[in-house]
């Protein structure tokens, strides 16, 4: 099935905008800019939403404004209201277990400790598509909170942006429902040396 809803997970507020935890927001924000999709607050879905054409496909965008650990309060109502099947849903989020500059497309699986996914999966299951944007791990779990809530170093940010660009290039495949080709293209991305 083709992707009909693209969600970017993050935390609302200017103080969080450029933190690693907002990598999902960066993805959706860039899509909205690139394809001239107006984003506006939507109280019904506790988020910022938009709808428009991306590579000829009608797509909805969502950035929850509920803070990361309450993402389900935004995503679940929108999925249910519009009758979005899980295989039509793509959730972009930061991923500690992948180095900055890497990006992976995954379907199914657990929440992997990600609080945004942890709040969504009990309500809709786990068989949706995830765009896992690598932000790297700080080395010890006691440093995770500070890591995700801080800005990436300039070289890391360049690497993350390059990985996001690789996902943008695979978007036509995702929107056409060719998930396996998209997965191969995205997961095969390597930073230039």
From Swiss-Prot:
- Catalytic reaction equation(s): an N-acyl-L-alpha-aminoacyl-tRNA + H2O = an N-acyl-L-amino acid + a tRNA + H(+)
Q: What is its EC number?
A: 3.1.1.29
Q: What GO cellular component is one of the record's annotations?
A: cytoplasm
Question: Residues at site: Stabilizes the basic form of H active site to accept a proton?
Answer: 94
Q: Name one Pfam family in it.
A: Pept_tRNA_hydro
Q: Which InterPro entries match?
A: Pept_tRNA_hydro, Pept_tRNA_hydro_CS, Pept_tRNA_hydro_sf
PROSITE patterns in the cross-refs? PEPT_TRNA_HYDROL_2
Q: Which BP terms in the Gene Ontology apply to this protein? A: protein quality control for misfolded or incompletely synthesized proteins; rescue of stalled ribosome
The active site of this protein is located at 21
In terms of domain of life, where is this protein from?
A: Bacteria
Query: GO molecular-function annotation terms?
Result: peptidyl-tRNA hydrolase activity; tRNA binding
Q: Does the keyword GTP-binding apply?
A: no
Group of enzyme by EC: hydrolase
Location within or outside the cell = Cytoplasm
Alphabetically sorted, this entry's keywords are: Cytoplasm, Hydrolase, RNA-binding, tRNA-binding
UniProt site (Discriminates between blocked and unblocked aminoacyl-tRNA): 11
Sequence positions that bind tRNA:
16, 67, 69, 115
Q: Which family does it belong to?
A: Belongs to the PTH family.
> What does this chain do?
Hydrolyzes ribosome-free peptidyl-tRNAs (with 1 or more amino acids incorporated), which drop off the ribosome during protein synthesis, or as a result of ribosome stalling.
Q: What does the subunit section of this Swiss-Prot or TrEMBL entry state? A: Monomer.
Indicate what this protein is called per its UniProt record.
Answer: Peptidyl-tRNA hydrolase
Species annotation: Psychrobacter arcticus (strain DSM 17307 / VKM B-2377 / 273-4)
Gene from which the chain derives: pth
